[in-house]
């Protein structure tokens, strides 16, 4: 019954959520959105295609090649940054460095400052043009530091409000010195649980995959709302980004991990959790949900 009551509260909280999201800066309609499928839920990033084109192209190259699949967050500095993009993991082979392509030219600009909720490229100390695979999320306003060293760190995207809730959950995890074989690369690593013997996948904050979401203008209104709800309530809509389908007039997505459905029909949004009730439950107006999703960047 906890799941049922919680889902029912989603609709009642819609207007409060929309009011909070209204304070966020508008996202350009043409911005590319990338979803990192983490073990704690999706982290959605609106890329600054026009402002940092070389850096965005570099990042998308790794996303599209699958380089970030089975990677993990390898550094957490609470109140500062969390960092990923550097290593993949398999229980058979351990941590493996993500293969790096050519370094990208630094595109730092003071108009894209290292403030909370942004993603920026990591790089080698003393070399402004050395960014390759690794990136970090700013947990705080770090402009006074990161804007003023090593040529400035290039911000190339902004995390959506639901995505930052996931980032904050990662930042709240225990941090350990995971593996001295990697020098200082894994000496501030967040862990889901401590290993009892050998390190295994379930110990890491894994990123199962990274993928572009379809362009907003190519999505249905329902799909935009589904993407938003998946990010806002990952505990109920998992795994995120399943295919949409139709049945009996409903346009819906099925979430296998939670055995739940989200659907729309005749301008209304619905959910169904068969294990709790055979009845389809209303969540409110699709138009209102779309307004909240749009303000959040979806």
Q: PLM features: residue spans?
A:
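Bacterial N-terminal signal peptides
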Residues: 13-25
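Bacterial N-terminal signal peptides that target proteins for export
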Residues: 2-16
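Cyclophilin-like peptidyl-prolyl cis-trans isomerases
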Residues: 29-298
